[in-house]
Amino acid sequence: MDADRIVFKVHNQLVSVKPEVIVDQYEYKYPAIKDRKKPSITLGKAPDLNRAYKSILSGINAARLDPDDVCSYLAAAMALFEGICPDDWESYGILIARKGDKITPANLVNIQRTDVEGNWALAGGLDVIKDPTTAEHASLVGLLLCLYRLSKVSGQNTGNYKTNVADRMEQIFETAPFVKIVEHHTLMTTHKMCANWSTIPNFRFLAGTYDMFFSRIEHLYSAIRVGTVVTAYEDCSGLVSFTGFIRQINLTAKEAILYFFHKNFEEEIKRMFEPGQETAVPHSYFIHFRSLGLSGKSPYSSNAVGHVFNLIHFVGSYMGQVRSLNATVIATCAPHEMSVLGGYLGEEFFGKGTFERRFFRDERELAEHEAIESTKTDVALADDGTVNSDDEELYSGGTRTPEAVYTRIMVNGGKLKKSHIKRYVSVSSNHQARPNSFAEFLNKTYSSDPR
């Protein structure tokens, strides 16, 4: 009989069924560009830049902006931000620029235009008389792109957080090399009318293009990135968390994965390290793949690699990291099991280090040290997991190896020890927990544990 089937009786009739559940119907799309064509969008007719500036500035002051007009202006304004490419710039086989070439953000992408006129062709901007300077254009571009960052601020950030962020960004665009073009608090007022603009594909595309350009090219107006920096590694929280994790515990990616003792990691690790992607290539299209429309559903998000994400932040929570305590638990990815493994890994890497002499007074001392090390015989006793570290707080846990950690988990029946629970409760109870956060999960799960 099929191993996946179960047998039972209904009204004395033998029934055999194969239990099946709803599966994810969406396919993850990897961002690799295989046709060697630059990311592309289509916008309306290119505007007269000065007339467009006047129209959009008038719209900002009235807190009434048309996203199509804004996108058309942002694309046209790219010509104002010319810079020199410091090195040959290539990504996914696409030559963006050669070293020494003069380039603008428009060189990174393909912007196609239609004959459809924007609203500025009909009205707007009549209250602005003089033609704007480049600095004024740069200020307007910066303020418009700040709308993207503001629309990405999480709703969990309460109080005046968003207002304070908006005010600080406004201050940037009213000091040299920028110039003040709007009154105080105008940006926040405008944002309230454009609160969901991060979901507009063309606006997101242009924000990512500007960010990719200014992250590579030294420019007088590079501070424009203050509004676009959130497009870098957007929807990559799983991969970003893993990268931070291996740096935190001072292991290579390969070494860290050896500690992932759960079958559900297999598919996620395979997904996260799909060949052919430029995850480790500086200034690649990969960094901005989400905003540039290269992937509809990111294979690197926290939901795509939820077990990995949960484990990493349970370890981070064990170590008392605020970022991990505030992160949102992926409830569908075995958080209870991940908290157990996170406790053991947290214990393994928290408050311990691997140290060795690396610097010496002279060559003679270095040679003597190397000779001693080469002849030294280490007698490493295998950790049988029988030492009760609950009673021996200073117990080091033996050698730092995946085998030793796995043995301790098995000897303890796959359960947390008192010391783990005590640590989890300590870090979570002293933290103001956000809804659905790791701090809240740990506090609710283990604060009343009798162990």
UniProtKB/Swiss-Prot annotation:
Changing T134P: In strain: Isolate Switzerland/02053/2002. It is found in: Virion; Host cytoplasm. Gene3D superfamilies: Nucleoprotein, Rhabdovirus nucleocapsid protein like domain. Disulfide bonds: none annotated. Changing F205S: In strain: Isolate Holland/9018/1987. Encapsidates the genome, protecting it from nucleases. If expressed without protein P it binds non-specifically RNA and therefore can bind it's own mRNA. Interaction with protein P abolishes any non-specific RNA binding, and prevents phosphorylation. The soluble N-P complex encapsidates specifically the genomic RNA, with protein N protecting the genome like a pearl necklace. The encapsidated genomic RNA is termed the nucleocapsid (NC) and serves as template for viral transcription and replication. Protein N binds protein P in the NC through a different interaction, and can be phosphorylated. This is Nucleoprotein. It comes from European bat lyssavirus 2 (strain Human/Scotland/RV1333/2002). The lineage of its organism: Viruses, Riboviria, Orthornavirae, Negarnaviricota, Haploviricotina. The gene is N.
